[in-house]
Amino acid sequence: VATDGQGVLGAIQSNEQAALMMCAMATTLQGRPLLANGANMAFRREAFLELGGYNGDRFASGDDVFLVQRMMRAGKRIAALPHPDAVVRTQAEPTFSGAVQQRLRWAGKMRGVSWSAKLLPAFFLLYPWGLLALTVGINWPALVGHQLLMHALLLAGAWALWLAPVPALVHHGKRILGLPYSTWSAGLAWLAFTIYAPLIAVASLVVRPVWKGRRV
């Protein structure tokens, strides 16, 4: 799904969607799909009916993720198609409050995913904050003459492991989606995501936004 938007808020959403799409494809190719987007998801009618359709869904939003999870548990074959003809275009939320509400709704979909499957995303969200605490907490002056360079290089490598992969992921995703890529824009979106994603994840545990007239 390609997200088209204007300004800083639109760019953040566009880059975020490209990264999430690539994560969805990666987990699908690994045989453990974590995310799904109903805007361009297709399934066989027979498989859908065999699993009872959407019966049993307890939340107003998330039917796409819940269905994919049921398909996976039933041993159905699930695939991803990274092809321009499969791209669906959507508009970014034009307001900050709208974007926050949308992300609260998306995060709420994780209720349908097993706790074991959520461990890696949770580590991913908390990794930079733990790394920041470690970086700030080190008594750097005391390390002068005592393996200062080694500690600095190890931390630099740890930060590089966090910083480098996602912009490259966004670049590849935007190429598939036919969208222009900017390193600065991707970096800004990555920084913003690092700040708001943990807050959204925690808030989604207690906040249930209204969507299509119902609380999700």
Where are these regions (language model features)?
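Catalytic donor/gating beta->alpha subdomain of glycosyltransferases that bind UDP-sugars
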Residues: 1-22, 49, 54-117, 214
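Short loop/turn motifs at secondary-structure junctions and domain boundaries
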Residues: 32-34, 199-200
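Short secondary-structure boundary/capping segments
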Residues: 32-33, 78-79, 208
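Conserved nucleotide-sugar donor-binding
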Residues: 35-51
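Membrane-embedded multi-pass helical conduit in multi-pass membrane proteins
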Residues: 121-208
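Membrane-interface alpha-helices
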Residues: 206-216
